[in-house]
Regions:
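Nucleotide/pyrophosphate-binding catalytic subdomain
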Residues: 2-3, 17-27, 32-305
Length: 305
């Protein structure tokens, strides 16, 4: 299969070339970028793995993520960064809340229940997410909530990835894996506004700096654990607040990290074996497209497939 997700079209400077690594049970790679391994010390060599919402919403999926991350670290002798999306469907709920849905409190309550139930499935205590869920609830009582300014909306939208990554880090550590957690907003910076860029896109559909110097990699690699987990979708705005990369931005986050770290690979993983002619969850007879080049995939995406 030729991967359809070779590089985000609006970030063509990242220069990603696609190959396909072997699949693991329950998850399949949709793309992998490769560049020659640098001569840097092993502690500074990175592989980036990205997992979407359905891939982080069940316990057995997290088991696979942990196994894959450890395998990549062991086989390369390097380090691994895992980038995750929010649990499946959570961003849709947060979008409704950010848009001012009349039943926002009920939606937040449902999200709290769902995440606590997931903690129970993982045999983790409620304290793992106590502060994060309290922060989500507090956003409804924030004075900004009445007028819903863009900076408040960005904070709401980014909660899903902060929650899922916190759950994942706690679970993987409970399984004895050397995982640390990091806030993507401390490492990915939104670019200054472009000419004629709308205020909305300056906050909720940003591009990020992807050309980092040796200082970035040195500081990043100083984090003590062999493997790290972070969030897709979010970055730091120029005012220090939260910025959003836009829907589907978690894949782009992984590409940014890969470029900044000079990673040897960036792998985008999913729970389906490739690109289909239609959504297989909605169309039972959807066909797996066994061969598809980047431009064909781009055309299909443009038509809303």
């Amino acid at each position: 299969m030729v991967s359809p997700v070779t590089q985000p079209s609006r970030h063509s400077g990242l220069g990603i070339e696609s190959v396909v690594p072997p699949a693991l049970p329950g998850l399949s790679p949709t793309s992998e970028s490769t560049k020659p391994m640098s001569a840097s010390p092993i502690a500074d060599r990175w592989i980036v793995l990205k997992f979407g919402g359905t891939s982080v919403s069940r316990r057995h999926r997290w088991n696979t993520i942990g196994q894959l991350a450890k395998k990549r670290a062991d086989e390369t002798g390097g380090r691994v960064l895992v980038v995750v999306s929010a649990l499946s469907g959570v961003t849709n709920e947060l979008t409704a809340i950010a848009d001012g849905a009349a039943d926002s409190r009920e939606r937040v309550a449902a999200l709290v229940t769902r995440h606590n139930e997931f903690l129970a499935e993982l045999e983790l205590g409620a304290e793992v997410l106590a502060e994060r869920l309290a922060a989500l609830q507090a956003l409804l009582d924030d004075p900004r909530a009445a007028s819903r300014p863009l900076d408040w909306q960005a904070e709401v939208l980014g909660q899903g990835e902060l929650l899922s990554s916190s759950v994942g880090a706690a679970y993987l550590r409970s399984n004895g894996l050397d995982f640390g957690w990091m806030d993507a907003r401390e490492w990915l910076d939104a670019l200054p506004p472009a000419p004629n860029q709308t205020e909305w896109s300056q906050r909720l559909s940003v591009n990020c700096q992807w050309q980092g110097g040796g200082d970035f990699k040195q500081r990043f690699s100083a984090q003590p654990t062999r493997m790290l987990i972070s969030q897709g979708f979010i970055a730091r705005h120029g005012d220090g607040g939260t910025a959003i990369l836009g829907r589907g931005g978690s894949d782009t986050s992984a590409a940014y990290f890969g470029a900044l770290l000079g990673a040897s690979r960036v792998e985008i993983w999913t729970d389906v074996p490739g690109m289909f002619s239609a959504n297989p969850k909605d169309v039972p007879d959807a066909r797996l497209l066994t061969r598809l080049d980047y431009y064909e995939a781009q055309e299909i995406a443009t038509t809303g497939a």
